[in-house]
């Protein structure tokens, strides 16, 4: 069973074609069931956005997927096929990683695509078409996309320390104007950051501070709301962006609090910018899949990188993706070997049991134990070596050299052993 990606996008097809093969959300379950009912496809997920329609699937033979895509939309295959691309295994994995990381987007590094890929995986899981291969693929995809966005400047052009928080948010959310922002603290750094966010026109801003009077004063200047610190835990799911900088000696935002918020948000991403020293947000929060946590050091590094970091980020992102593709394919190949490993062990166990039973019969007859053990070891050795020996002696011509190489590698032999 192999993984494949098939589809078309803004690089290969005009809008007039893309809109004709887009999947409506209310027909997605039906489409997934129909695709996997075709017998040639065992697992499937469908990503359908304004700029792309892609099928990610596991199959023995991928050819019929294009026929199915055209047929589902009642289009002649000849009308669709000139715009289609099809990627097998390695190329498919790399493509999905690049898509989710924003490297294949119309706007380089745009953040919405990751949420759309997550939604495609969720819909496939709900429809029962997300099997072991695709589940593992999407797990790796989300981890790669997060690594790319967290460790490169693929979606940002940072120009100042205070503006960095807004630009870091822009890596994850295309429009800050659609987001709800929470500021924890009311000192100078928070005020500077809040001014930059206000310039981006977020949907709402809220200030939480230990001293309510300072929170109210800052909120009044920004046209923001206020909140008590002890209300953050319950209110956190409402916010898409959290910027914190207090003088608290202990973290204000804990792992459990954020885990609950992510669950309530149905895994919509949340950006946390922690400018405090000591930190206001527990570091473990950064390990959560849907949380993008940045510290004061992260902002400093991005500022130092400057405007040229964007093109360098593409190179860095491609390097990350290439490494992660190799890792995923290693898992795939190891998984493919499992049936052979199981059969090999079962074969060896059958031989072992046969020799043990023969030895026990000989011992029951009163034969010399040392002789019985010698016979057992020789018998087991001969039976285990019979297959490799036969493999070598039956090889002919150029195949004999290859057979010798395989056996030497298999048993960790050198030519002088």
From Swiss-Prot:
The active site is at residue 50. Keywords: NADP, Oxidoreductase, Porphyrin biosynthesis. Pfam families: GlutR_dimer, GlutR_N, Shikimate_DH. It catalyses: (S)-4-amino-5-oxopentanoate + tRNA(Glu) + NADP(+) = L-glutamyl-tRNA(Glu) + NADPH + H(+). Catalyzes the NADPH-dependent reduction of glutamyl-tRNA(Glu) to glutamate 1-semialdehyde (GSA). PANTHER family: GLUTAMYL-TRNA REDUCTASE. This is Glutamyl-tRNA reductase.
